Amino acid sequence: MSTIKVKSAHKDGQIKLEDLDVVCNKLCKRNNSVLFKLEKYLNKKLLSDPELTEIRDTILTVSGELSRLRDNLVTDGDSNEGLQ
């Protein structure tokens, strides 16, 4: 598969191109950071409450989908047999 780049705005205002894998990895880390900060802010574990568990599971699902994004991409010329 060809290299996929993503435009990324940095704190200094510059626009840079980063590999898709790098961007997805950063987003996964941010999700994990949000979970940690949420537990710290609430002063309780997210697994201690059904609604918080649902929020946790949603965030972890998004992280998982980001991790698998490259494997699920279809670009022009790729075979998409069985996807219909």
Curated annotation (Swiss-Prot):
Protein name: SPbeta prophage-derived uncharacterized protein YomY
Gene (UniProt): yomY
